[in-house]
Amino acid sequence: TASGKLQRKFLDRFAISMGRGVALGKTYGTLGAASRGATLLQDLLFTEIIFAFDRERVPERAVHARGTGAHGTFLSYEDWSNLTAASFLSAEGKFTPEMTRFSTVSGARGSADTARDVHGFATRFYVDEGNFDIVGNNIPVFFIWDVIIEPTLMALHAQKPNPRFHLPRGQQDPNRISDNLTARGDSLAQGSQISSERGSPKAYSNTEPNKHRSFRLVTDNGKQFQCSNHWQPLQGFIDLGVEEAWRFPEEGEGYVAENLFESIELLTVGDEELEIQSMSFNNDLRERFNSSEVTKSSVVRLVPLITQGKLVFNKNIQMLFNEVIGAMFQPGHIVRGVDFTEDPLLQGRLFSYLDTQLNRHGPNIQQLGFNRPPRAPIHNNNRDGAGEMIDLPPFASFVETQEWGAKDIKQTAVGQNKFDQEHRFSHWKFGVNGFVHTRNDDNVTHARGFFTAPERGQQKKRVAAFDRMFTVVGLSVDGQQANSDQYADFDAAAGKKVAKAIGVEAPKPNSNYFHPTDVFGEHIAASGTKYGVPEGNTKGVLLASVNKPASIAQGAKLQVVASSGDFAEFFISAKQLNMREVTQGIIPLVPVLKLAKLDLGKTFRFQLMQVGNIEELERFGFDLPDLTDKQVDLSAMGMFETTFRPTSRAAQFEQGKTKLVKGLQGKNAFMDRALKQPSNNREKIQRFADRFAVQD
């Protein structure tokens, strides 16, 4: 091969030498006392080689050990200085070099990267001020939301192989992980998503990674926003499929990594767009939706996604050890314009990430090749230690010195030094204690929304995946029953489907939760009754089919529960409307939607939809599509995103880049209105329209 010829050419130019540079010639034997004598201890070449070999392996990562990587470039779509002072987002068209590490979470270094698992996606931006890391996974929620639980769940215990005989090789023991997840209600949302197509992506560049830990963006004038990151693959998400997902761990240990390598070499790799959800710290949504609670995802319709830029992969890694094993990503790597939040998982990981990296590579990990910031000089007070590689000047290793002069570091609220000021946590409203804070004990709503509102055709696929996961991999009968019962908690129909697929007794509906019967859609509740009724300023409608009287009865029950609160004045009695000669029941919860365009068919199913405030509706318009003979999740309609600049409503369409998240074309005015809006992104809107079109 070309690389082999290059290696031989390189070796032919040089004689074998020792680490200190002394050439020894082309000899490959040890020194002996005679032709058949004992090896001599004075053979320092042998000792140097063997000592280095014995120390080649560094401690394996406790999680994310199996990985690969790629280099690329990030392009900022525009100037985002209204949200952050970070320089890589400071100008339209600004390019920033980056590197990304892809991984599985549970498997060992040599395990199959096709195993059903959470998949890591860590990106490092080499920005002007230093290195900025976005560390996340391909699933928007997490198992736990307090870091003290993490070692038991993640590191070496529940998600690892059976400790008795370490099987399955490098993968999870199904009984151990099932036992843990079914005992924890807050793990339900992520557990259900791992069991779906999201647990077995076919290509790393076609996953939908998320930085599920929230963080802060800070502007030059000190304005703060609480944010979360999302990556969106422009080629769409691609999974292995149910059968391949269970066959590949046996046949293709490096399939996903090889797929990434070849796609970059052939220039067919997909790009990823960076999207964020942002809200100010005085936004009342922070009280309704605990954005620091990573077991639940934020509501896109209430906190719209803003597309900030695009990540392009353009170069493969050259050495796995240097660029993947030796690359130290951590959430503590932030730059000016980015800061931390009170997220308990984040706070614990700020300590844990650095601790485990120091354990693996020593105290000078920042001096290793791809950990060094290429655009920013290093002026810290670190000295000596194993692995010291930088020639430091003979300066005093402390700030206050008469010889070199002491600088007056001002504590300012704005400008370059604003991140040093004492009031950086002035938004903190809670006392310090040892109790676990949460504003939302509802652990089933997000799992229900994921399972009952998938893309068309995915629900059967997910049930089939559950069948394989709960039967083929050797899960005990008790474990199968426990999983079936847990799925019944978030949806009675889902529990029955899973139970039937795996051949266990169908669970009874849990009376503590509202169970849809003939509904299809996403239900997200902030915090409320056991029926999942949202509180606060939520607007939405509940639609139920009279073909299923139970759905009308449940809707009425939901309405009664909701109307008993302080906002009962917003609720009106159930109505019957005739649409397309099929009567549907409509129970409005704050009737702000204009139903003039509503055109429903026999198979329309929808549980609860939340939209933004009335101003959002007036600003962007909201027309419903033709859903005749279609099962469509209206939550996929989405809205427009803007840069939310403080300009007039009319100017927002002209200045802010708009983008349609999801839409359905069909015979409706929604897409027509979208395409008529002033926008420099009209081609992208049309592509999305074609992709999500409803076929007659």
Swiss-Prot record:
Chain residue ranges for the region called Disordered: 187-211
Protein name: Catalase
Annotated binding of heme, by residue: Y353
Keyword list, A-Z: Heme, Hydrogen peroxide, Iron, Metal-binding, Oxidoreductase, Peroxidase
EC number from the UniProt entry: 1.11.1.6
Annotated catalytic residues: H64, N137
The species this protein was found in: Penicillium janthinellum (Penicillium vitale)
PANTHER family registered for this protein in UniProt: CATALASE, CATALASE B
